[in-house]
Amino acid sequence: MAPHVEQLEFQAEARQLLDLMIHSVYSNKDSFLRELISNASDALDKLRLEAFRNKDLDVDTSDLHIEIVVDKEARTLTVRDNGIGMSRDEVVRLIGTLAKSGTAELRQQLREAKDANANEELIGQFGIGFYASFMVADRVELLTRKAGESEATRWESTGEGSYTIETVDQAGGEVPQGTSVTLHLKPEDREDELHDYTSEWKIRELVKQYSDFIAWPVRMDVERRTPASEEGGEETVTVETQTLNSMKALWARPRDEVSDEEYTEFYKHVAHAWDEPLETIAMRAEGTFEYQALLFIPSHAPFDLFQQNATVGVQLYVKRVFIMGDCDQLMPPYLRFVKGVVDAQDMSLNVSREILQQDRQIRAIRRRLTKKVLSTIAEMQAERPEKYRTFWTQFGRVLKEGLLSDTDNQETLLRVSSFASTRSDDEPTTLAEYVERMPEGQTQIFYAAGESRQQLLNSPHLEAFKAKGYEVLLLTDPVDEVWVESIHEFDGKPLQSVAKGEVDLDSEADKEAQETERQQREKEFADVIAWLTEVLGDHVKEVRLSTRLTDSPACLITDTFGITPALARMYRASGQPVPVEKRILELNPTHPLVVGLREAHESRGADDELAGTAELLYGTALLAEGGALEDPARFAGLLADRLTRMVGEQS
């Protein structure tokens, strides 16, 4: 029978799509191989289903597979499967028409049929992946024969608006069942990201990256050369067929069927890591949104965890096909240390299959994954404290970012967080443990925020709390300065900074007993306080007696609702305008320096020397909390003058 050859035009939409595909849709030209393997996998799934449903279909399904064939001399690459194949009409309808892969229709049939044993893994719903071949090929040939039919069909196009299609008589049996796609490759061009797709190692790399977990074996014949055994002899060349993909989708297997060693090896593969995972999280969701996830919490923080371009470490698969690495839509930024994969069964994607739509499903999956990771951290905290301590040391700082960004899980994040405190040099505490230890009469959770533990321990702000035996949380991460401004309580207990507002640590009985003494001191210091308020008016908004100092002469505090200097510096560093706020200078009425300053002011009134002493008092308070002097040279001059006179008096 003479071949029935036609030359047809692509539909207008298909022509536009071809141009879009070649020039802009795919961000990576390597994606073409993923698309061809996905289509081949789809064809194998369809054949398996058809053989299951149609007992009259006489086909062999014992060795379903995908084959990659390269010809270096001809510069061709062929992807071949022995799946369902296509008829001539289907080729015209599916290849010459925009986005009609047939898989979406088949999935609808599956929903209706509910064939429990068919277990299809169909991935071709995107319908346009075949056209990606034209990114790397000048000409594409497709040869296909549908299972159960004798005629085959050959399709060919250069991607320039038209294609030829012909019927191939199967009388000679030269066309096997299934589909083969042959790409006549464009010249290699590294600048245009056109690689050598006839290279065995490049093909291995792409299959490993994109299609490692496809359910069907992806095979390729490879040459192996053995050096000559004797001098002057010839090397031996053998050809062996190798399977390039692992086909091990661990997330699809029940957890009790997977060993810890297998999980560890998979973690190292997917995370490009050298350590072992601290925790493994396997989950499956069924119902409205079906997906499987295999996530890992690493043992060590990556070096780039806090870099500006740090990315989420979760990969997205759809029907075991790699879609996207570092999928930030599946995990919030504060969980960017989590590694693993999510395999969705029916996720809506946009045209490139590389950029997810912000749809209801992806948001639902993200919420569930987030809650699962946080619940795992909570389990570690309660049941595996050693692992939790390792986790917190490595990732606690980044986890606390969620206190600012994730209001839905804020309570959980507070409970799984740990903080250093004055109770122990080594053991951090949770907020729940802190509250449990609060003595009778304490109604607030006290904290100090600063740059280092040592700086905070030496801070004048802690003196009264140490004297009373109250535990104080020591917050030293930059994010701490921010979240404490937005979270005001835990378990009904207010969070109170030791450096903000007024501190009242005495019981009612103590306050009554000390009231007369307090009033007397207020009178004694009224004049010097008024004078200091005037002299230091450029630096402070108020001067008052302190109830938080026991050893230091003075300290600076912020209004209850004011912005701390550290937080103001952070805002300014990020480009946000922050007005300069004057703070409050508190004096220790029992300190010799403050008492001497009061007596000197009473005896000789205000003078320049006393004003210099006032500036030194303010400067020492600023330095004691780790602050920076506004005019270090003036402070040094005043200090040198006082030291000179002191040495002179002693000599």
Curated annotation (Swiss-Prot):
It holds the Pfam family HATPase_c_3. Keywords: ATP-binding, Chaperone, Cytoplasm, Nucleotide-binding, Stress response. SUPFAM superfamilies: ATPase domain of HSP90 chaperone/DNA topoisomerase II/histidine kinase (SSF55874), HSP90 C-terminal domain (SSF110942), Ribosomal protein S5 domain 2-like (SSF54211). It comes from the Bacteria. Residues 570-651 are annotated as: C. Gene3D superfamilies: 3.30.230.80, 3.40.50.11260, Heat shock protein 90, C-terminal domain (1.20.120.790), Histidine kinase-like ATPase, C-terminal domain (3.30.565.10). GO terms for molecular function: ATP binding; ATP hydrolysis activity; ATP-dependent protein folding chaperone; unfolded protein binding. It is found in: Cytoplasm. One of its GO terms (cellular component) is cytoplasm. Residues 354-569 are annotated as: B. Residues 1-353 are annotated as: A. HAMAP family: HSP90. Homodimer. Belongs to the heat shock protein 90 family. Molecular chaperone. Has ATPase activity. NCBIfam families: PRK05218.1. This is Chaperone protein HtpG. It comes from Mycolicibacterium gilvum (strain PYR-GCK) (Mycobacterium gilvum (strain PYR-GCK)). The gene is htpG.
